[in-house]
């Protein structure tokens, strides 16, 4: 192998940068350097990711993975990749690759030439830029480094400048190609028929030679028999001798052989006539073949002329486009000169304005710093105010709770005073009853009879004591019940206090959230004003999009307001579920914070996308846009024509196969019939000979005249049987 030539400096970074671009496709096989790409496996996987429909898995399975150092497998893989790329350009994109862009695969496989590999990778880049997923691939290119982006863009421009789009004159070329295809098909048919006729002539010549050999052998046998007849003429006078019998038998055989000879000569004449007809047909086919070859040469010449005219028309179109571009540039130059003069005048005005604006800017920066300090102080004061308001609310709630406790204590004090008074009255009554009972017990036993009425009167006093005791027990039970009820009431009051506390906290949080919403609205209004001021300076499209974003954010804020109002109504309606409402309010605040963060993130993303779009618009030339709608229609028509041509070719192939099968069947039938005729003739000859022998052996006592009559009858029967077999 020859040593590779030194590479130009412009070709080396192309291969390296395209390898970096290939690494963006996550392939199974490595693609770090030139040697890893020489097998063609990674390039095939990249093409499969670019267009799955065209470079399908069946196509990918043709490319062998286990290559090793076998350069033949590498070359076959690279040929398959290059063939797939050219067919994709020609059939799917409707473009022709110029010969300058086609790489030398032998240099890639043998020498690992990065220049030729760079050309092949450049064609893959063209497939990626012109496919259906081209926007994704362009975004991937924009994520690369600036130097790599520059090299990739130059490679794309090189491809665009050297691509040849198929012109509308391709219809006439298609018709000529169809005529050429038809002529070639007829030529192939004529050649096939010629070969068949040659084979048939050879077969007939072989048959003629065999028949001539048989004839010569029969003639020689005839001569031998004649000689024997001459020798045995004397012995034929006596019919009873064995020689006479043999003579008659040989004479019969001779007559049969003569008849067969006549029949073979007739068949020979037929074959000769048929052979002459076939030779005439062969001459006609040769003339037709010559005419078709001349037509094919004319079509090739016309095709070459069409290619030349197409190249000249492309050059003329390019020159016309360049002339129009130069005219537009001249007109733009005159306009630019006028604009330069006006801009120089306005530049002086702007210089004075900038000096004055810089002074104002210094003052504004100082004022802005003061404003920021004031804003921070205001925020600190707001936080302090919110904390103090919360503290005041809690203190007011505790004050209310203490007042309620004071009122309950006063009520309990009054109740205890009433209980004390009742207990004093009961105590006095018990003392009186006890004194009466002691006085009655100290009386004499003799006075019992006289004081029976008094004892009867004292009995109700005991009952009265029992009644008083029962009243006391009843009061004590009531006091116990009231104590249990008071404990329960205290528990309920504690629960109520907790709920009231939560209510106050929720009200304070609601008030603070309202203040926060007001602050957010003020901030949004300030942002709208600043955006309006910036919109007058920036472009119209970006400002309109930012306004749409702001309107969307405003709609979101209104939705949040509506949700807050609904939540307030729910708080007012469902006071016992204050804890759940507090959780919902905290969730809403978290959602608000998330929405604010999402809004900020969306604005930052939007700015990034705008900058990327501007960079892409600056880098890409607007003249290199995809083809117009008319070219797309022409491509569709060409695809439909190609489909029709494929269908017609398949039908033509099927018809040829059917004709060939019919011819084979006819020839086989003809050969089979000849074989059966030969077998029938041989069987009849054998049966006739055996019949003659039997007749001779069975009738030894016949006379000479009877024998002659019998021979003539057998001859007639044989002559009748032989033509019948021929007709069969």
Swiss-Prot record:
Annotated region (Sufficient for interaction with microtubules), positions in chain: 1-555
One BP annotation, GO: protein localization to perinuclear region of cytoplasm
Signal peptide: none
Keywords, comma-separated and alphabetical: Acetylation, Coiled coil, Cytoplasm, Cytoskeleton, Developmental protein, Differentiation, Microtubule, Phosphoprotein, Protein transport, Spermatogenesis, Transport
Region (Disordered): 481-510
Main location: cytoplasm
Function as written in the Swiss-Prot or TrEMBL entry: Component of the FTS/Hook/FHIP complex (FHF complex). The FHF complex may function to promote vesicle trafficking and/or fusion via the homotypic vesicular protein sorting complex (the HOPS complex). FHF complex promotes the distribution of AP-4 complex to the perinuclear area of the cell. Required for spermatid differentiation. Probably involved in the positioning of the microtubules of the manchette and the flagellum in relation to the membrane skeleton.
Domain Calponin-homology (CH): 12-128
GO cellular component annotations of the record: cytoplasm; FHF complex; HOPS complex; microtubule; microtubule cytoskeleton
PANTHER family associated with the record: HOOK PROTEINS, PROTEIN HOOK HOMOLOG 1
Tissue specificity: Mainly expressed in testis.
Protein name (Swiss-Prot/TrEMBL): Protein Hook homolog 1
Modified residues (N-acetylmethionine): 1
Region spans: Sufficient for interaction with AKTIP and VPS18: 657-728
InterPro entries found in the cross-reference section: CH_dom (IPR001715), CH_dom_sf (IPR036872), Hook_C (IPR008636), HOOK_N (IPR043936)
Modified-residue entries (Phosphoserine), positions: 235, 719, 727
Location(s) in or outside the cell: Cytoplasm; Cytoplasm, Cytoskeleton
Disease involvement: Defects in Hook1 are the cause of the azh (abnormal spermatozoon head shape) mutant phenotype, which induces spermatozoa with highly abnormal head morphology that differs drastically from the compact and hook-shaped head of the normal sperm, leading to a strong decrease of fertility.
PROSITE patterns per the UniProt record, alphabetical: CH
GO molecular-function terms, A-Z: actin binding; microtubule binding; protein homodimerization activity
CDD domains associated with the record: HkD_Hook1
Domain of life where this protein originates: Eukaryota
């Amino acid at each position: 192998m020859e040593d590779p030539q030194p590479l130009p400096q412009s070709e080396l970074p192309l291969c390296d940068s395209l390898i970096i671009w290939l690494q963006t496709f996550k392939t199974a096989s490595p693609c770090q350097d030139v040697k890893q790409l020489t097998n063609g496996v990674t390039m095939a996987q990249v093409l499969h990711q670019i267009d799955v429909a065209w470079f399908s898995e069946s196509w990918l399975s043709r490319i062998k993975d286990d290559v090793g150092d076998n350069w033949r497998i590498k070359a076959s893989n690279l040929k398959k990749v290059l063939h797939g790329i050219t067919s994709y350009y020609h059939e799917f994109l409707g473009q022709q690759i110029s010969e300058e862009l086609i790489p030398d695969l032998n240099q890639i496989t043998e020498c690992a030439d990065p220049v030729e590999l760079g050309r092949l990778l450049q064609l893959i880049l063209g497939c990626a830029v012109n496919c259906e997923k081209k926007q994704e691939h362009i975004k991937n290119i924009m994520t690369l480094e600036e130097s790599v982006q520059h090299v990739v863009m130059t490679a794309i421009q090189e491809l665009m400048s050297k691509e040849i789009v198929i012109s509308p004159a391709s219809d006439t070329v298609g018709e000529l190609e169809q005529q050429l295809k038809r002529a070639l098909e007829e030529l192939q048919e004529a050649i096939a028929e010629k070969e068949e006729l040659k084979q048939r002539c050879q077969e007939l010549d072989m048959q003629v030679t065999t028949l001539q050999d048989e004839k010569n052998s029969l003639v020689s046998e005839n001569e031998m028999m004649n000689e024997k007849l001459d020798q045995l003429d004397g012995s034929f006078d006596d019919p009873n001798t064995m020689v006479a019998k043999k003579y008659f038998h040989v004479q019969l055989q001779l007559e049969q052989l003569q008849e067969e000879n006549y029949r073979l000569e007739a068949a020979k004449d037929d074959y000769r006539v048929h052979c002459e007809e076939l030779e005439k047909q062969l001459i006609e086919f040769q003339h037709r073949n010559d005419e078709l070859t001349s037509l094919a040469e004319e079509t090739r010449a016309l095709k070459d002329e069409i290619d030349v005219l197409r190249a000249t028309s492309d050059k003329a179109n390019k020159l016309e486009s360049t002339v129009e571009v130069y005219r537009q540039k001249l007109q733009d130059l005159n306009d630019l000169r006028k604009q330069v003069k006006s801009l120089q005048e306005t530049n002086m005005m702007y210089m004075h304005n900038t000096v004055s604006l810089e002074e104002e800017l210094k003052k504004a920066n100082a004022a802005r710093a003061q404003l920021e300090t004031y804003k921070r102080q205001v925020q600190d004061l707001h936080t302090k105010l919110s904390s103090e308001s919360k503290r005041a609310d809690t203190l007011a709630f505790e004050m209310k709770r203490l007042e309620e406790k004071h009122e309950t204590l006063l009520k309990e004090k009054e109740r205890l005073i009433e209980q004390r008074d009742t207990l004093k009255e009961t105590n006095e009554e018990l003392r009186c009853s006890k004194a009466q009972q002691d006085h009655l017990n100290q009386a004499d036993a003799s006075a019992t009879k006289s004081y029976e009425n008094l004892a009867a009167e004292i009995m109700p006093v005991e009952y009265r004591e029992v009644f008083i005791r029962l009243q006391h027990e009843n009061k004590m039970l009531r006091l116990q019940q009231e104590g249990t009820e008071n404990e329960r009431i205290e528990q309920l009051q504690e629960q109520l206090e907790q709920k009231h506390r939560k209510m106050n906290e929720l009200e304070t949080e609601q008030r603070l959230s309202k203040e926060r919403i007001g602050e957010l609205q003020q901030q949004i209004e300030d942002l709208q004003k600043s955006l309006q001021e910036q919109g007058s300076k920036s472009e119209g499209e970006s400002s309109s999009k930012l306004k749409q974003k702001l309107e969307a954010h405003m709609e979101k804020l209104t939705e949040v307001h509506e949700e807050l109002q609904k939540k307030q109504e729910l708080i007012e309606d469902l006071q016992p579920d204050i804890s759940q409402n507090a959780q919902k309010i905290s969730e809403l605040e978290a959602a608000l914070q998330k929405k604010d963060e999402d809004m900020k993130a969306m604005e930052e993303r939007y700015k990034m996308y705008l900058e990327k779009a501007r960079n892409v618009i600056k880098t890409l030339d607007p003249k290199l846009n995809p083809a117009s709608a008319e070219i797309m229609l022409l491509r569709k028509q060409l695809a439909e024509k190609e489909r029709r041509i494929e269908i017609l070719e398949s039908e033509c192939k099927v018809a040829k196969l059917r004709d060939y099968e019919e011819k084979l069947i006819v020839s086989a039938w003809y050969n089979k019939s000849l074989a059966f005729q030969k077998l029938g003739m041989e069987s009849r000859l054998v049966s006739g000979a055996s019949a003659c022998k039997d007749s001779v052996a069975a009738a030894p006592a016949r006379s000479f005249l009877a024998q002659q009559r019998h021979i003539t009858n057998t001859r007639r029967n044989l002559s009748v049987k032989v033509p019948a077999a021929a007709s069969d």
